[in-house]
């Protein structure tokens, strides 16, 4: 075979091999719990302006996001609604050692539509007979759903209201059920209430386990350096200020 032909064949082989390799995604891919949906819009804007790094968020319940990571999803960073799930991924060897950090503490709230004929002054009022249905996030997948169950039990109305509960896949879907009138109210994250059009009442923090929320870098993620920069931004002064504006308590403010 002529040398020129061999060289051309080698070039084609190299090109085909390169084409078969999976390309790194152009954006930093962050899996984030849905309670962060509103806050992340502002976080994304500020981070991209300050760093020039594009971000793509994948929202879902913390349990579902963790399952995706366990199945090999090319995620760079998990920003969870609890600390237990990141610790679980850490125990499986799926995270960057030493990267698990608490970034905020969330609060649970009862939300209902502003135009509703119903009004709530406390969680116990969900037991009133005129409340036909209300929504919570699936407690098997969503930390805010588990907190809702704990709060209903602490309020002494669990047995009474359990038949009226509608389970949503995540806390954002629970809110959407209430917004669209499919249910009269929903137990959701305060962070989803503060800029909305509805009405809401805060649930006593002592009625459920603390909603300490942690982040962790995923080992083998295609954009680890960029993920480290986002984590530093979220834990820094500007990121913490944004979280506080959405009703989160930040580590320095948590007693």
Go through each PLM region and give its residues.
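Bacterial N-terminal signal peptides that target proteins for export
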Residues: 1-9
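N-terminal non-cleavable signal-anchor helices
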Residues: 4-5, 20, 202
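Bacterial N-terminal signal peptides
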Residues: 9-19
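Exported/periplasmic ABC-transporter solute-binding proteins
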Residues: 23-52, 56-73, 80-83, 87-96, ...
